[in-house]
């Protein structure tokens, strides 16, 4: 029995869909959506949905640097009954997380991974909308701004996907699929897209 725990509905959805594509029955649990699969031994969930009374064989806890978040950080400190736990985080969280493990009297092994693609900063200012290219992700901070920018791009004939927190789950899934498949050229999103979500963003 396994469980994936992440900070975002979008991440839980991504893992759920990858499991299903691999032929693994998977249940998805988030604050707004529950999808139960028959004979499922795997759960993909937002971290707050963890049932601490359940026992698991293996667990993946993602984006554990969120432990420093003043509103949600406590959710990454709850105990999970599991002999093998994989905790994914940025290096900044390593000291805090390993200290908690030691307080519990448990052991750990650290594995570090390097980013496969280099992050490159643009040297010149970005001119919107003239310099928008296929594969771009435009990040804004409100739903209103997402819809405004997407509307401006669509009026110029640029097919656009939109992602923001309150988007209904089925529509959100469709928007992600369309961008991943190249059916839309650009994605406009709130900053939630930046936390672990795997999309074919070029810039």
Each predicted region: which residue ranges?
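Helicase motor core with emphasis on the C-terminal RecA-like subdomain
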Residues: 1-2, 6, 10-43, 48-60, ...
